Amino acid sequence: MTSPKLPLLVLACALPLAACAATPEALKPYPAASSGYNRHVIELPAQADEAEHKVELIAGKTLEVDCNTQRLGGQWQEKTVEGWSYNYYELGQVGPAMSTLMACPDNSRKQAFVPVGGEPLLVRYNSKLPLVIYAPADVQVRYRIWSAAPDTSPAPQQ
């Protein structure tokens, strides 16, 4: 005999996942991914004060690297859906890896995530709209949530 608590537990676990999935209706204004690109959609949970948070978008590839610092070339663009004023982000073609040229010890090669270089892309935190990103199909898109410290510090006058 199945415990009546098990179906309730499964339902309780599944509901938050269903709520976080972007509905086709929410994505309708956004263009489909063009050939060779993938569309990535991030649904952010609601925060008490969303102005105190930012989302950092990080794109890159998992490559075989050595002890040198590696970066990929690429440029983010912020675009707007026509007629909707919804923003989305597009990463253009990602160039070859750039690297420092230090001598590395033998057997220092490993698989690691190599990000697209340049300034980090920090975007406004908004749980009411999906965060839509278009990137080349061979590129991974990751993100990180930044939160402001609750205290501020006065700037000294000079």
Regions found by a protein language model. Give the residues of each.
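Solvent-exposed loop and beta-edge segments used for protein-protein assembly and interaction
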Residues: 34-36, 49-51, 83, 125-127, ...
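Bacterial N-terminal signal peptides
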Residues: 9-18
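Mature extracellular/secreted ectodomains of secretory-pathway proteins
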Residues: 109-113, 120-123, 135-138
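Mature extracytoplasmic domains of secretory-pathway proteins
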Residues: 51-118
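C-terminal partner/receptor-binding element of secreted or periplasmic proteins
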Residues: 124-158
